[in-house]
């Protein structure tokens, strides 16, 4: 068997099947752009479904690929077992109605055993087949020459996911030798059993039947081949190492973690080994996922990334790493994978920035969680219980992102346990709340009453017209059918033809009037009815509106004009965000009204002022270029091939509406737009903010609203200049002068504060007491913040030379605590970090730090004196 790297095995596989007439399909993005309902690409065949289901005919029916994949159904097993991963590569060869079993089996054997390729010893290979698959048995035994005793028949060798294509499969196993199992009484020690000796190398699926709705199976007219070989597992066999983690696909990340942590992999500590494995696996997943456009967040694929990073940070604590470090591994992943995935190194700076940002956020959360947990433990001790309630554990998890496993570790240190059943009960309550929230989405109560019974058609013609003659085909009042609405009454109605746009895709509904002889009806809102028609919410202002009446339906054109300006502007904004911030930006929500637009998007940090200026400039330049906006109907596949942006979670039909702004923007959209960007006039960003981790929001105005906003800003500038007794053009110079004056005054104030602190520190030396021969000072002081506490601490250390000091200051019902230990006493075992943690816990807080200096916070000022009294107890305990 050859000595090969993981990269060489990958390339060798693709080269082999290229020689056999296969087209190499590029590895697709982990974010499945062609299937918005799928969270991740999770297999080699996932990106080829369009070929297997007949939607697209491949140019070559023989395909091979090396597909990056993510599976997260068993995250908790990663690191515990030899081969569980969240990110992996699947090597595969596929036949779309071309070759079948004989070629698939023959080529698999050739690749594995030929000296030109992998060069496995044939005697170490065994295969499994379905008991009724005599064709596979004949090929394996008579053509390939595998002895009968190494062909195992297993009932589970049948690939079936319910209705649709299905068929038997054959798996190839490699015998790693007696070192991995030699107990003849082990019932699982056989190819296909649960053991470490016989490892599955390759799975060949023969899709030859259709599983019918009645449970029967009938032969497929065109038979397919779908195979899968896990690169990581194959590499572990070729490199003769005990686990996938010991291959060159993982060891560089493990080695880098060793250097950062100072700990050693495979040092005999199973917990530390698991930590190394978790970190190596999870950084691969996060690196590739972020590179493909996913960002940490609280839902969907972003939540998966957040969970993986937090799990890695938790395990890093076992390696004594309490700072952000995962981001340092990103370029290491890039180097390992650069031969086949050069884009990772190209994007490494961006990916590392995202990872570091998320790590820093979680370390802040951990600190907050530790403080809350200290309160929970103290409360439990007061109540004389040794169990942390499920409610408290869930609050730590849900509010502070505090893993329950970490809560358990702290509880164990305090001689306590966690109520797991209570925790799971709280988790289930949250799931129920989420399920209920998802079901409660019927705006205007359009899902209730008789509306679901209305099947009459209603055609929307509002893209091309603003007024039309229509018939009232359904009239509803208080959830029931009615024949008429009187003046002053409200109701809901449907028209056979309507120019009124129903709220959808972030665009609000049109408003306007229905007019006929002596009747005037205000259309206040329009929503989609249960069966898809436009449902108009109306109030009769004059006359009596009757069912079957013929009316003139007229939208408010001034209102619509403002709406379409803002809607087209969101498309320009979306593309400008991608241009300036990066291709990871994706729409996360929008609101388009007549007054303003709001656009939510994925991004890991605040958008900087200069970036906002660039974004605004780009949008305005596209407006001033007077670009035509073209709208067309396209087949979904054609639209995607054109590069049209689709939204995650949206369901699209076979034919979609494509909105194209020149060669700049291309999106699938059902909304209303301007004919030319010049109609927008001007675009002005009003605000940028964060609305959740990984999601930002931009609010903006266009046209007249933008002009009025800028006019107001100019007026404000003039008013400010007047108050500063200067001209608007000189206001910056005036402000700079004022800042310089303030800075000088602050400097003088700080100097006075330092002198006062020094005087107070001198007075405090009288409060020093001797405890077992150690100078101890534990007292409250009157200072404004932690900086002044540090200054005072430095003065006291210099004056006392040898002492244990704890200072506490109360401001705005909060307690700042600072502990200091002089160098000579640090050497005797006194530790400021441990001391301040204990003191803070006694006044409702937490903290920590170095042996010589540490800080903490507390929430109960009334308990400060009691907390400070503990300092003498601590000194006595150490001096014993």
Curated annotation (Swiss-Prot):
Pfam families: DHHA1 (PF02272), tRNA-synt_2c (PF01411), tRNA_SAD (PF07973). Keywords: Aminoacyl-tRNA synthetase, ATP-binding, Cytoplasm, Ligase, Metal-binding, Nucleotide-binding, Protein biosynthesis, RNA-binding, tRNA-binding, Zinc. Zn(2+) binds at residues 567, 571, 669, 673. InterPro entries: aa-tRNA-synth_II/BPL/LPL, Ala-tRNA-lgiase_IIc, Ala-tRNA-ligase_IIc_anticod-bd, Ala-tRNA-synth_IIc_core, Ala-tRNA-synth_IIc_N, Ala-tRNA_ligase, Ala_tRNA_ligase_euk/bac, DHHA1_dom. GO terms for molecular function: alanine-tRNA ligase activity; aminoacyl-tRNA deacylase activity; ATP binding; catalytic activity, acting on a protein; transferase activity; tRNA binding; zinc ion binding. Gene3D superfamilies: 2.40.30.130, 3.10.310.40, 3.30.54.20, 6.10.250.550, Bira Bifunctional Protein, Domain 2 (3.30.930.10), Threonyl-trna Synthetase, Chain A, domain 2 (3.30.980.10). Its EC number is 6.1.1.7. It is an enzyme of class 6 (ligase). GO terms for biological process: alanyl-tRNA aminoacylation. It catalyses: tRNA(Ala) + L-alanine + ATP = L-alanyl-tRNA(Ala) + AMP + diphosphate. It is found in: Cytoplasm. Its cofactor is Zn(2+). Catalyzes the attachment of alanine to tRNA(Ala) in a two-step reaction: alanine is first activated by ATP to form Ala-AMP and then transferred to the acceptor end of tRNA(Ala). Also edits incorrectly charged Ser-tRNA(Ala) and Gly-tRNA(Ala) via its editing domain. HAMAP family: Ala_tRNA_synth_B. Belongs to the class-II aminoacyl-tRNA synthetase family. Consists of three domains; the N-terminal catalytic domain, the editing domain and the C-terminal C-Ala domain. The editing domain removes incorrectly charged amino acids, while the C-Ala domain, along with tRNA(Ala), serves as a bridge to cooperatively bring together the editing and aminoacylation centers thus stimulating deacylation of misacylated tRNAs. This is Alanine--tRNA ligase. The lineage of its organism: Bacteria, Bacillati, Bacillota, Bacilli, Bacillales.
């Amino acid at each position: 068997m050859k000595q090969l790297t993981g990269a060489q095995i990958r390339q060798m596989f693709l080269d082999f099947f290229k020689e056999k007439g296969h087209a190499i399909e590029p590895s697709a993005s982990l974010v499945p752009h062609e299937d918005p309902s799928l969270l991740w690409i999770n297999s080699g065949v996932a990106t080829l479904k369009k070929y297997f289901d007949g939607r697209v005919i491949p140019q070559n029916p023989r395909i091979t690929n090396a597909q990056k994949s993510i599976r997260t159904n068993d995250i908790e097993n990663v690191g515990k077992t030899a081969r569980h991963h969240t990110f992996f590569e699947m090597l595969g060869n596929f036949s779309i109605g071309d070759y079948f079993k004989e070629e698939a089996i023959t080529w698999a054997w050739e690749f594995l055993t030929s000296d030109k390729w992998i060069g496995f010893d044939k005697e170490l290979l065994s295969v499994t087949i379905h008991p009724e698959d005599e064709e596979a048995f004949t090929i394996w035994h008579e053509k390939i020459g595998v002895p009968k005793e190494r062909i195992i028949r297993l009932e589970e060798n049948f690939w079936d996911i319910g209705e649709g294509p299905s068929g038997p499969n054959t798996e190839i196993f490699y015998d790693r030798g007696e070192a991995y199992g030699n107990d003849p009484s082990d019932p699982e020690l056989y190819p296909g059993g649960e053991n470490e000796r016989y490892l599955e190398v390759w799975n060949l699926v023969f899709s030859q039947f259709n599983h019918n709705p009645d449970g029967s199976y009938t032969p497929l007219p065109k038979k397919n081949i779908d195979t899968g070989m896990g690169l990581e597992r194959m590499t572990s066999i070729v490199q003769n190492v005990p686990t996938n983690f010991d291959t060159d696909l993982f060891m560089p990340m493990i080695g880098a973690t060793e250097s950062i942590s100072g700990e050693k992999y495979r040092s005999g500590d199973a917990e530390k080994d698991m930590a190394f494995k978790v970190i190596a696996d999870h950084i691969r997943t996060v690196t590739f996922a972020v590179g493909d456009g996913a960002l940490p967040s609280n839902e969907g694929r972003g939540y998966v990334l957040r969970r993986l990073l937090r799990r890695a940070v938790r395990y890093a604590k076992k390696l004594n790493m309490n700072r952000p470090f995962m981001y340092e591994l990103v370029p290491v992943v890039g180097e390992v994978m650069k031969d086949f995935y050069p884009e990772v190194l190209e994007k490494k700076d961006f990916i590392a920035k995202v990872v570091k940002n998320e790590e820093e956020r979680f370390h802040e959360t951990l600190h907050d969680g530790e403080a809350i947990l200290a309160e929970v433990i103290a409360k439990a001790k007061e109540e004389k219980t040794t169990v942390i309630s499920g409610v408290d554990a869930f609050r730590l998890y849900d509010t502070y992102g505090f893993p329950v496993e970490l809560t358990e570790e702290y509880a164990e240190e305090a001689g306590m346990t966690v109520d797991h059943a209570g925790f799971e009960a709280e988790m289930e309550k949250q799931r129920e709340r989420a399920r209920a929230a998802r079901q409660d989405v019927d705006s205007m109560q359009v899902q209730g009453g008789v509306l679901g019974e209305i099947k009459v058609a209603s055609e929307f013609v509002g893209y091309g017209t603003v007024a039309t003659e229509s018939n009232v085909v359904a009239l509803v009042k208080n959830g029931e059918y009615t024949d008429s609405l009187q003046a002053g009454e409200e109701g809901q109605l449907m028209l056979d033809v309507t120019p009124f746009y129903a709220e959808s895709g972030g665009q609000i509904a049109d408003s306007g009037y229905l007019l006929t002889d002596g009747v005037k009806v205000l259309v206040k809102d329009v929503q989609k009815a249960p069966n898809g028609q436009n449902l108009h919410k109306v109030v009769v202002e004059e006359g009596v509106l009757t069912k079957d009446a013929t009316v003139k339906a007229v939208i408010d054109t001034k209102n619509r004009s403002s709406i379409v300006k803002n809607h087209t502007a969101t498309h320009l904004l979306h593309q400008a965000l991608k241009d300036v911030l990066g291709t990871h930006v994706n729409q996360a929500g929008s609101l388009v009204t007549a007054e303003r637009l709001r656009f939510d998007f994925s991004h890991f940090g605040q958008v900087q002022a200069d970036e906002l200026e660039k974004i605004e400039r780009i949008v305005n330049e596209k407006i001033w270029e007077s670009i035509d906006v073209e709208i067309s109907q396209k087949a979904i596949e054609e639209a995607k091939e054109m590069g049209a942006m689709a939204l995650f979670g949206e369901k699209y039909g076979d034919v979609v509406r494509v909105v194209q702004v020149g060669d700049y923007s291309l999106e699938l959209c059902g909304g209303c737009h301007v004919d030319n960007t010049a109609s927008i006039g001007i675009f002005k960003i009003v605000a940028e903010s964060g609305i959740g981790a990984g999601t930002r929001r931009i609010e903006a105005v266009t046209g007249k609203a933008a002009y009025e906003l800028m006019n107001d800003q100019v007026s404000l500038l003039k008013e400010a200049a007047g108050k500063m007794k200067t001209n608007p053009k000189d206001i910056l110079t005036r402000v700079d002068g004022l800042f310089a004056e303030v800075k000088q005054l602050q400097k003088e104030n700080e100097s006075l504060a330092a002198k006062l602190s020094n005087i107070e520190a001198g007075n405090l030396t009288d409060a020093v007491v001797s405890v077992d021969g150690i100078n101890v000072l534990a007292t409250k002081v009157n200072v404004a913040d932690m900086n002044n506490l540090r200054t005072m601490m430095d003065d006291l250390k210099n004056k006392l030379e040898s002492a244990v000091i704890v200072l506490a200051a109360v401001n705005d019902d909060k307690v700042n605590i600072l502990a200091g230990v002089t160098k000579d006493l640090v050497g005797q075992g006194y530790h400021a970090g441990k001391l301040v943690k204990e003191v803070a816990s006694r006044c409702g807080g937490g903290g920590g730090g170095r042996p010589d200096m540490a800080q903490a916070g507390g929430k109960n000022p009334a308990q400060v004196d009691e907390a400070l009294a503990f300092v003498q107890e601590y000194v006595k305990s150490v001096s014993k």
